[in-house]
Amino acid sequence: MAKEQKMQSSPQALKAGHLPAVKAGGMRVSKKQGNEENSAPEKNAKKTLQEKPSSVLNMTKMQAMNILAGELEKLSHDFPGEAAQIAHQKPRPTVEKTILPKRLYIIQQPRRC
């Protein structure tokens, strides 16, 4: 089988730089080449854990959390929570709107016999 592909991949068998189409069931189907150079990387390839150990990742996450906690504490002293609540409350209307009941549409239809 490998010899057959090598024979077909010779410059004489190539058309427009690729293998000619194959007929299957009366329709032309393109035939994919089995080049290792142009093939996609393996889907099951796993990253090595040696690049970034989990302990280093945990330390960087903890440092980021400590920095954020310190900043949030400073902001809470500068801006009290009551002021934030008042700023976000909706103004209450002085006059309540009365909601009218929806109008019923009665459609006259003939009775079923």
Curated annotation (Swiss-Prot):
GO MF assignments: death domain binding; ribosome binding; translation initiation factor binding; translation repressor activity
Name listed for the protein in its UniProt record: Death-associated protein-like 1.L
One BP annotation, GO: cellular response to amino acid starvation
Pfam families on file: DAP
Top-level taxon of the source organism: Eukaryota
UniProt family annotation: Belongs to the DAP-DAPL1 family.
Key word Protease present: no
